[in-house]
């Protein structure tokens, strides 16, 4: 089972690919997709899609796991995040991948044991839980690893 974990965002999206081989979890790859806030939103969404599409084609995941979002007090920010999620979900659908969504607190609790963990705690724990993640320093990338990890360890596939 290969999971593509996604921490959705318009400015800095995190992605990660984690596999389960028998009882062993294996980190395969991760990264961030940064877009320029000065670019038109449709160009930013297209860049996110084309970059994630390359990840899907290279790693051939069976499923995508994406973090659910909360409604921010800034409605414009929430709307833009909704655009990004819609574009990502459309790509997931186009490749006929199953998809699971996880609440941020569920991911935090699964990875750290505490549903209100801070970003640095998540980063620390994924480095302990998944060999190969020691070079990750970006919290968006770490969150994507944590989302994929949550999908695999909760057997939500």
UniProtKB/Swiss-Prot annotation:
Its main location: cytoplasm. InterPro entries: RNaseH-like_sf (IPR012337), RNaseH_sf (IPR036397), X-over_junc_endoDNase_Mg_BS (IPR020563), X-over_junc_endoDNase_RuvC (IPR002176). Its EC number is 3.1.21.10. Keywords: Cytoplasm, DNA damage, DNA recombination, DNA repair, DNA-binding, Endonuclease, Hydrolase, Magnesium, Metal-binding, Nuclease. The keyword DNA repair applies. Belongs to the RuvC family. GO terms for biological process: DNA recombination; DNA repair. The keyword Nuclease applies. The RuvA-RuvB-RuvC complex processes Holliday junction (HJ) DNA during genetic recombination and DNA repair. Endonuclease that resolves HJ intermediates. Cleaves cruciform DNA by making single-stranded nicks across the HJ at symmetrical positions within the homologous arms, yielding a 5'-phosphate and a 3'-hydroxyl group; requires a central core of homology in the junction. The consensus cleavage sequence is 5'-(A/T)TT(C/G)-3'. Cleavage occurs on the 3'-side of the TT dinucleotide at the point of strand exchange. Pfam families: RuvC. Homodimer which binds Holliday junction (HJ) DNA. The HJ becomes 2-fold symmetrical on binding to RuvC with unstacked arms; it has a different conformation from HJ DNA in complex with RuvA. In the full resolvosome a probable DNA-RuvA(4)-RuvB(12)-RuvC(2) complex forms which resolves the HJ. One of its GO terms (molecular function) is DNA binding. It comes from Rickettsia massiliae (strain Mtu5). Its cofactor is Mg(2+). It is found in: Cytoplasm. It catalyses: Endonucleolytic cleavage at a junction such as a reciprocal single-stranded crossover between two homologous DNA duplexes (Holliday junction). Mg(2+) 2 binds at residue 67. The active site is at residues 7, 67, 140. Mg(2+) 1 binds at residues 7, 140. Binds 2 Mg(2+) ion per subunit. It is an enzyme of class 3 (hydrolase). This is Crossover junction endodeoxyribonuclease RuvC. GO terms for cellular component: cytoplasm; Holliday junction resolvase complex.
